[in-house]
Amino acid sequence: MKRCTKLKILNTFSVDVYAEKVIIINDEYSLLQLWKQSRDQDKFFLILGAGSNVLFLENYKGIVLLNRIKGIFVTENKVAWYLHVGAGEEWNTLVMYTIKRNMPGLENLVCIPGYVGAALIQNIGAYGVELSQMCEYVDVLDLNQGDKIRLYCHECCFRYRESIFKLNLYKYAILFVGLRINKHWKPVLSYSGLTHLNLNSITPRQIINTIIFLRYKKLPNPIIHGNVGSFFKNPVVDFKVVSFLLKKYSNIPYYFQEDGKVKLLAGWLIENCNLKGYILGEASVYYKQALVLINTRQKATGTEIAALALYVYNKVVDKFNIRLKPEVRLIGSFGEINPKKLFLK
C-alpha cells in the first residue's frame, strides 16, 4: 500500500485539494482489511478510480482509496466471449484489449477516461451504446456486512448514467465486472457522426478511428484544461415539454426513448443560452462543446467550477424551464454532497 495526500493529479478537473490519506488497493484482501480498520476506528473513506467524474469542492477529511484491482480473464463459447475484469483496469485499455483480440463490441465506448469499476457506477455510454448492455454481473464487497457477493445485471438498477452503485455509493465496493460480448457483431452507427459510415463494410477499427477523431475534435485534453467530459446529463422529459418548446424553438433537437419519453441535448440548451466560452474566474464553458466545463488554466478551485455550473444551470432554467442534473459527483469535506443542495432553483 502506497500513501500520499495530494489529490490534484488524481482528479481530471485538476482541482488542488488534499485528503487525510490516499491508499492504493491492489487486491480484495487489502480492501477488506482496510474496510474493517475504518469501521473499527469510525473512519470514512472514498473509493476513487481515475477521478474522471468527481468535483472536489474542498479538502477531503477522510481516506481516499484508489481501486487498482487488476486482471482480464476471458472464456468463450459458440455465441459469446465472457470477460471477468478487475475494477482497477483502465477502461480504454480494456476496449483496446478486446479489439486487438478480435472481440468487437466495445468500440463505441473507446477513449472514455476512467477505470472499469467507475464505468459501472456511472453506466457509461457513448455513440449509441451503454455499458449495461454488456454487463452480466458485478462482484462487490458489501460495505455493511463485509461479505463478497455477486449482483447480476437485473439487480444493478441500470438507467441512463445511473446504477445501484451510484445510488448507494457507500454500500458497495466493486471488485470485478463480468461482461458478455456477442460473437455476432452488429455495428452501432445510429449516432450523429457515425451515420455516414457504410454498415455493410465498416470494421471495428474504423469505428474506433472515427470516434477518436470526433472526441479529440470537440473535447479538451484534461492535461491542458481540467475537465470531466460532460458535466450535465442530457435531460429526459415528457413529450408535452418538447411540444411546448417546439413552438418557440423549432430547431431544438430531440430523441424519442423506448419508454416514450424524449431526450434533449443539454449541450444545445447551454449553447442556446449563449454560454459557449463563458468565463467565471478560472473556470469556463469550453468554446467547442458547451456541455463541458473546464479548469481553464488548471488554477480553478472546486467552488469556482461549482459556481460556474450553478450559473449555467440557472440560465437554462430561466430560458427553457429545464432543470439539468449533473453527471459529476460533488465531493465535500466528509463525502459526497447531494447535488440538490447546490442546484436549488
UniProtKB/Swiss-Prot annotation:
SUPFAM superfamilies: FAD-binding/transporter-associated domain-like, Uridine diphospho-N-Acetylenolpyruvylglucosamine reductase, MurB, C-terminal domain. Its main location: cytoplasm. GO terms for biological process: cell division; cell wall organization; peptidoglycan biosynthetic process; regulation of cell shape. Residues 15-218 form the FAD-binding PCMH-type domain. Pfam families: FAD_binding_4, MurB_C. Gene3D superfamilies: 3.30.465.10, UDP-N-acetylenolpyruvoylglucosamine reductase, C-terminal domain, Uridine Diphospho-n-acetylenolpyruvylglucosamine Reductase, domain 2. GO terms for molecular function: FAD binding; UDP-N-acetylmuramate dehydrogenase activity. Pathway: Cell wall biogenesis; peptidoglycan biosynthesis. Belongs to the MurB family. This is UDP-N-acetylenolpyruvoylglucosamine reductase. It comes from Blochmanniella floridana. The gene is murB.
